[in-house]
């Protein structure tokens, strides 16, 4: 059952049987609807020697599924109905979103459900996205004036061993050293329903949002075992 969180904002929340939390924000003034799924994992959760894995997975999540969605088809499918999609990585979370016409809400939820349950983590996809991330680092940091400033600030403020002591873009040596077993383990550890929050906002009724969330994301298998303790550092 949906429970209202705030009468003013019309926020409603529930938890699916597999542990995924759902928030629905009906807004009749919106012509479309946004789907935003937040995974509670970011660069602060990376172990030493694995710097850049959280951001790498932001890219891998667009690389297709074992259920038949081809690489780059996720984005192309959303754009074909007049929508947009993107993702971002921070210290404490990674999020993925689609903004689509109201009639395409089920499509967006289906796409998110497919890559949660059937992501194609393959040698080919790993090699491709590793090079994409390295090129992004070259463009945004290595070949930019003062591009190393963030790295220096984080290291100076927090220290190299602190969870916030390195930028989300990651380390090229760590990315080069990553093998398929490493990234598969990262995925199975963090990308699970009970470590995610699904937000649906826009032209959608609260009950409709719950039914569709249950239909698509509720079908993702319940993860086994406990979530790992997130890395802590001194404030």
Spans of features found by a protein language model:
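M16/insulysin-pitrilysin zinc metalloprotease superfamily fold
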Residues: 63-67, 99-132
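An aromatic/glycine/proline-enriched structural segment found at the starts
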Residues: 2-3, 160, 164, 168, ...
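M16/MPP (pitrilysin/insulinase) zinc-metallopeptidase core fold and M16-derived inactive scaffolds
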Residues: 34-99, 165-169
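N- or domain-start disorder-to-order transition segments that initiate the globular core
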Residues: 2-31
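Scaffold signal of the M16-like zinc-metallopeptidase fold and its non-catalytic homologs
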Residues: 64-65, 108, 140-193, 213-216
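Stable alpha-helical elements in mature extracytoplasmic
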Residues: 49, 53, 70, 74, ...
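Acidic/histidine-enriched alpha-helical segments
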Residues: 79, 120-138, 205, 224-235
């Amino acid at each position: 059952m949906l429970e209202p969180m705030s009468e003013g904002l019309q926020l409603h929340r529930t938890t699916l049987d597999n542990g995924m939390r759902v928030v629905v924000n009906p807004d009749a003034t919106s012509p479309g609807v946004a789907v935003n799924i937040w995974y509670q994992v970011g660069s602060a959760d990376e172990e030493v020697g694995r710097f850049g894995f959280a951001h790498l997975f932001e890219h891998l999540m667009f690389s297709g599924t074992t259920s038949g969605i081809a690489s780059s088809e996720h984005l192309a499918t959303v754009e074909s109905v007049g929508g947009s999609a993107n993702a971002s990585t921070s210290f404490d979370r990674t999020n993925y979103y689609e903004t689509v016409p109201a009639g395409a809400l089920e499509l967006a939820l289906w796409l998110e459900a497919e890559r949660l349950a059937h992501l194609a983590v393959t040698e080919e996809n790993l090699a491709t996205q590793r090079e994409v991330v390295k090129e992004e680092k070259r463009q945004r940091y290595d070949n930019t004036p003062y591009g190393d400033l963030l790295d220096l600030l984080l290291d100076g403020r927090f220290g190299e061993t602190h969870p916030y002591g390195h930028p989300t873009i990651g380390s090229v040596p760590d990315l080069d050293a990553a093998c398929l077993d490493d990234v598969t383990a990262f995925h199975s550890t963090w990308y699970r329903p009970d470590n995610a929050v699904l937000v649906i906002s826009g032209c959608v009724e609260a009950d409709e949002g719950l039914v569709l969330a249950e239909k698509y994301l509720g079908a993702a298998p319940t993860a086994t075992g406990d979530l790992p303790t997130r890395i802590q550092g001194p404030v």
